[in-house]
Amino acid sequence: MSGEEKLGKLRAKLKEITEQIDDADQKKVEAKHALVDSLARLEKNEVEVNSAKRRIKLIEKDLEDSSERLKVAEEKLIKVEAEEKKIEEARNLLEEAESADDEKMYNIEEEFKESKRTLESNETKYIEAQRKGVVISRDVEKTRDKADTLEKRVAVLEQTIASAGESLVELEEREGESSEREEINEEKLIFLAGQFKESEVRAEAAERSCNVLERNIFETENEINTWIQKRKEIEDEMIEMDTVADEPDDE
């Protein structure tokens, strides 16, 4: 082989080596770039990892805070539920109280109506009692007047009886004085005896009438006292009802 051929081969070999070196340099540069990129990505990844760790810590802190807040919220919820239960119980008690108040108010209104009717009835009875009291008082006055009249009549009859008795005594004394007057005196004696008997009958009748009138007066006075007592009871009851009606309801 000639020297030119060897030189050509060497040149070709050198060129190949040069190209290989250039390729190696290019690969080296590319490898450096790749390394730089990898380092950059690694650094970036480390930053991201650190950031992720910080975020994880923050999330863990938030989770811990959230757990604490959740615990506090649960405690508040329990308190709220207890308060709601108390409020519900209070509302039920209030509704029951309102229902009881309504029933009580209805009963009070009914009692007031009944008291009003009783008051009106008592007022009517009071007026009737006053009217009857006036009538009875008049009857008592009339009865007393009749009793006075009868007592006067009894006194007159008693005087008449006394006079008749005296006349009988005088006639008996004069019986033996004159035989001529015997028949006349006997007739007078019979007449006076009849008057005496009649006077006695009238006196007894008058006495019975007086007794009846006295009983009537006694019964009438008792009736008047009864009506006075009833009127006082009615007046006291009316005053008591007026006092109760004027009192305010504290409940």
From Swiss-Prot:
The gene is TPM2. The keyword Magnesium does not apply. Homodimer. InterPro entries: Tropomyosin. The molecule is in a coiled coil structure that is formed by 2 polypeptide chains. The sequence exhibits a prominent seven-residues periodicity. It comes from Podocoryna carnea. Keywords: Coiled coil, Repeat. This is Tropomyosin-2. The keyword Lipoprotein does not apply. Belongs to the tropomyosin family.
